[in-house]
From Swiss-Prot:
It is found in: Plastid, Chloroplast membrane. Residues 68-89 have a biased composition (Low complexity). SUPFAM superfamilies: Multidrug resistance efflux transporter EmrE. It comes from Arabidopsis thaliana. Keywords: Chloroplast, Membrane, Plastid, Repeat, Transit peptide, Transmembrane, Transmembrane helix. The chain crosses the membrane at residues 122-142, 152-172, 183-203, 213-233, 237-257, 269-289, 301-321, 339-359, 369-389, 392-412. This is WAT1-related protein At3g02690, chloroplastic. Signal peptide: none annotated. Its main location: plastid. The keyword Chloroplast applies. The lineage of its organism: Eukaryota, Viridiplantae, Streptophyta, Embryophyta, Tracheophyta. Residues 67-92 are annotated as: Disordered. It holds the Pfam family EamA. Residues 133-255, 283-411 form the EamA domain. Residues 1-68 form a transit peptide.
């Protein structure tokens, strides 16, 4: 059996540490010089200095343990095993998606986990796909109760209970609470952009457009992320991704045109559900690029939970000030189905979906997981049609198809660009 070895250098006292991405990430391995490794996922350099007294050590991943084989001075070989102290992937839940940062372990070297070899059981596929199912169907559930409860109440209810559940889960797991002004300031700003603005714009948009169409527009946010990452982090866009950006703009225009033409002279930008959804997508995109900053100061799961709680409070206040129907006596008019829909959007559409995505991201390939994002608008469209009789016009169908192709091109693997 072949092991996924990565060569590393370690001192005999085992006191030095180096963070390794993969065998292909090492720029140089020379004695008396710097050993530089690139974490290809976060595009950062880690350096350590070694001298000729250091021994060559090989490492393999064995489940949750790290097995190291070293050659001693008398040329004998010894093998030790140590447990991994933390997950190799950190994820932050944002908007209706999750942003994950690989902390260094090569995805392809994960011999155990969900669909690691491209095959999997029915249960594994169900777990892998379930977050996208929950996010898509939560859009339908939200739209169903919006007229009865009000948009801002639904947005707040989706965030606050789910956030408290995630915080409780993080405490149960022994995750550290945010500490210091930097941690809380970053979470608060992240909450304002990714929770308050995103969910508020989303709820406003759902009042004026279909769940399926809105979900397609929301999922166009990788187009904006690609542009922001290029300007802020110097990440290369490339020919294929640039083509995807142009195609994405064309697709979004095709999605918006039917709304403009149908309203004629009465068209108002702020009365357009597609426009509100586009604003929500931009909020989510900005939240995506903020993840790296937030994760520097806080545990990812804690940050996810607290940003949902903090971001939901302004929405609740706006709901009260705006006299949403739920505060004007309509609460007693809620049917059992309405209550179930509200609970579903919060528990399954937020807390459970984020938790399952976290689990899948740490057990399987992030590339495979991110390639399934197109399922969210697909589920939203299918269940919007089944339960709300929503349909796409011919032009909107073309626009949705063009937009989804553009999203795929923007997420195109860099090595193939």
């Amino acid at each position: 059996m072949e092991w996924p070895w990565s060569a590393i250098a370690a001192s005999s006292s085992s006191s030095s540490s180096c963070f390794f991405a993969s065998p292909n990430s090492c720029l140089s391995i020379t004695r008396r010089t710097n050993l530089s490794c690139v974490n290809t996922s976060v595009k950062s350099l880690r350096h350590s200095r070694f001298d000729s007294k250091h021994n060559l050590v090989k490492r393999r991943i064995n489940g949750d343990s790290v097995v190291r084989r070293s050659t001693t001075s008398n040329n004998s070989t010894e093998e030790t095993e140590s447990s991994s102290s933390s997950s190799s992937v950190d994820c932050v839940g944002m908007g209706s998606d999750v942003e994950c940062v690989n902390n260094g372990e090569d995805e392809e070297n994960r011999s155990s986990g969900i669909l690691s070899g491209g095959e999997g059981t029915f249960l594994e596929w169900t777990v892998l796909i379930s977050p996208f199912f929950f996010w898509g169907t939560a859009m339908v559930a939200m739209k169903e109760v919006l007229p009865i409860t009000g948009p801002f109440f639904v947005a707040a209810f989706r965030l606050i209970p789910a956030g408290l559940l995630l915080v409780a889960f993080a405490v149960y797991k022994g995750r550290p609470l945010p500490e210091g002004i930097n941690a809380w300031f970053s979470i608060a700003l992240f909450a304002l952009v990714d929770a308050t603005c995103f969910q508020g714009f989303l709820a406003q948009g759902l009042q004026r457009t279909s769940a399926g169409l809105g979900s397609v527009i929301i999922d166009s946010q990788p187009l904006t992320v690609a542009v922001l990452a290029s300007f802020l982090f110097g990440e290369s866009i490339g020919i294929v991704r640039a083509g995807g950006l142009l195609l994405g703009v064309a697709g979004l225009l095709l999605l918006e045109v039917p709304s403009v033409t149908s309203d004629g002279n009465n068209f108002s930008l702020w009365g357009s559900g597609e426009w509100w959804m586009l604003l929500a997508a931009q909020s989510m995109a900005i939240g995506t690029v903020m993840v790296r900053w937030v994760s520097k100061y806080s545990d990812p799961i804690m940050a996810t939970g607290w940003h949902m709680v903090i971001g939901g409070l302004p929405l609740l206040a706006i709901s009260v000030i705006n006299h949403d129907p739920v505060f004007n006596g309509s609460l007693q008019d809620l049917s059992t189905n309405d209550v179930i829909a509200l609970l579903y959007t919060s528990i399954f559409g937020s807390a459970v979906s984020y938790g399952v995505y976290f689990y899948s991201a740490t057990k399987g390939s992030l590339t495979k997981l991110s390639s399934l994002t197109f399922l969210t608008p697909m589920f939203a469209s299918i269940f919007g049609y089944l339960y709300l009789n929503e349909t796409f016009s011919s032009l909107q169908l073309v626009g949705a198809a063009v937009t989804l192709v553009a999203i795929y091109l923007v997420n195109f693997p860099e090595g193939n660009d």
